[in-house]
Design a protein with these regions (language model features):
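Bacterial N-terminal signal peptides
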Residues: 7-17
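Acidic, polar-rich low-complexity tracts and alpha-helical solenoid repeat scaffolds
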Residues: 2, 20-338
Length: 338
C-alpha cells in the first residue's frame, strides 16, 4: 500500500515538475464540434470568406477527403448561415455522411437543407436521396446508436422518414411512392390497420395519378384482408375490405388485378359466412334462438354466390330446425292459452 502511494506521488511530481510540450490534435470549436488537426496543420483549410471555404469543402469532397469536406462545409453553415453558399455546404454535409454510409445522419442533414433552404437548387435531388435512404432502411439497414454503432432495424423509424418526405414535399415526384412505402412498413410490422390508413391517404391525396391511386386502393383492400384474417369474430374489417375492393373494381375496371380482386371478395364473403356461422352457433348453444336465426340468415345471404357451399347448407339446416322448434313452441303457447 505504501509502495503504491509512493509511486503515485512520484508520477504526480513528474507531471507537475517536468512539464513537456504535447501536440493537441483535437480542437473544439463552438458550432463545429471537435476537429482533428494534424501536428503542424495549423488549420490551413480555414478561409475567411464563405465562397473560398465552400471551394475547400467541394474540392475535398471531389477528392474523397470526406473528413476535410465535413469540416469545411460545417464551417460555412455555422459562420455564414445566410450566405448564398450555405445551401451547397449543407448539401455537401449530407453527401459526405451518405457516402460514408451514415444514412440517418445524411437524412437529417438533408432535412435541415430542405427546411432551412427550401429554395435550394438541389431540392428535388435531396428528396430523392432521402427516399433512397428510407428505402434502404425499409429493406433492413440498421439504425445506429451515437451515430457509430449499428444496433437494430426499425420500421417505426423508417415510417417516420417516409412521413418527413411526404410532409416536406407532398407533391414531389417521390411523395406518392413514399406514402405507399409508409403502408408497406406498417405491413412489415403486422400493423395492418395503420397500413390501410396509409394506403387510404395515398388513394385520396393522389387520386389524379391513376396508377398510384389504383395501387393504393388495391393495397388498402389487401391490408384489410390481412387484418380480417387475424380477427376471429370481428367481421367489420372483412366488410371494409370488400367495400374497398368493390370501389377498386368500379373505379379501375380495366386494371389487370380486377379478377384477383373478385376472387378475394369471394374469399372474404366466405370468411364472413364462417364468422357469422360461429356466432349463430354460439347463440344457439345458449338457447338464444332468435339471435341465432338472425346470424344463420346472414350466412345464407352472404352465400348467395355459392348457395350450395358447406356454410350455406349448414345454416339452412339449422334454420329449418329452429323454425320448426319455434312453430312448435308457438303452437303449444296457443293451445295453452285456450
Amino acid at each position: 500500500m505504501i509502495r503504491r502511494l509512493v509511486c503515485l506521488c512520484l508520477v504526480f511530481a513528474g507531471v507537475v515538475l517536468f512539464p513537456f510540450r504535447s501536440p493537441a490534435p483535437l480542437i473544439y470549436t463552438p458550432g463545429e464540434g471537435w476537429q482533428y488537426e494534424p501536428v503542424g496543420g495549423g488549420g490551413n483549410w480555414q478561409r475567411q470568406r464563405a465562397k473560398d471555404q465552400l471551394i475547400v469543402a467541394q474540392d475535398a469532397f471531389d477528392k474523397k477527403d470526406y473528413s476535410l469536406a465535413l469540416k469545411a462545409a460545417r464551417r460555412v453553415v455555422h459562420i455564414w448561415p445566410l450566405s448564398d453558399f450555405a445551401p451547397q455546404a449543407q448539401f455537401i454535409l449530407g453527401r459526405c455522411y451518405e457516402t460514408k454510409g451514415w444514412d440517418e445522419k445524411a437524412f437529417n442533414e438533408y432535412q435541415v437543407l430542405l427546411e432551412k433552404y427550401p429554395k435550394a437548387v438541389h431540392y428535388d435531388e435531396v428528396l430523392k436521396r432521402q427516399y433512397e435512404i428510407a428505402v434502404r432502411f425499409m429493406n433492413g439497414e440498421w439504425f445506429r446508436v451515437w451515430d457509430y454503432i449499428p444496433l437494430y432495424p426499425s420500421m417505426d423509424k423508417t415510417a417516420d422518414l417516409f412521413e418527413k418526405i411526404v410532409k416536406t414535399g407532398a407533391f414531389s415526384s417521390v411523395a406518392p411512392q413514399s406514402q405507399l412505402k409508409i403502408g408497406e412498413t406498417r405491413e412489415k410490422q403486422g400493423n395492418y390497420a395503420d397500413a390501410a390508413k396509409a394506403y387510404e391517404l395515398a388513394a385520396d391525396r393522389y387520386f389524379d395519378r391513376p396508377q398510384i391511386a389504383a395501387d393504393a386502393l388495391y393495397k388498402e383492400g389487401l391490408a384489410y384482408k390481412q387484418q380480417a384474417a387475424t380477427a376471429e369474430y370481428d367481421q367489420n374489417t372483412a366488410a371494409q375490405a370488400i367495400t374497398v375492393f368493390t370501389d377498386f373494381m368500379t373505379l379501375y375496371p380495366d386494371d389487370t388485378r380486377v379478377p384477383e380482386a373478385q376472387k378475394i371478395i369471394a374469399e372474404l364473403r366466405r370468411e364472413q359466412a364462417r364468422g357469422n356461422l360461429e356466432i349463430a352457433r354460439y347463440y344457439e348453444r345458449r338457447n338464444h334462438v332468435e339471435a341465432a336465426r338472425i346470424y344463420y340468415n346472414e350466412v345464407v345471404t352472404l352465400s348467395l354466390a355459392e348457395p350450395n357451399s358447406t356454410y350455406a347448407e349448414t345454416a339452412k339446416a339449422h334454420l329449418t330446425d329452429i323454425n320448426a322448434r319455434l312453430r312448435k313452441e308457438n303452437a303449444q303457447k296457443e293451445n295453452g292459452a285456450k
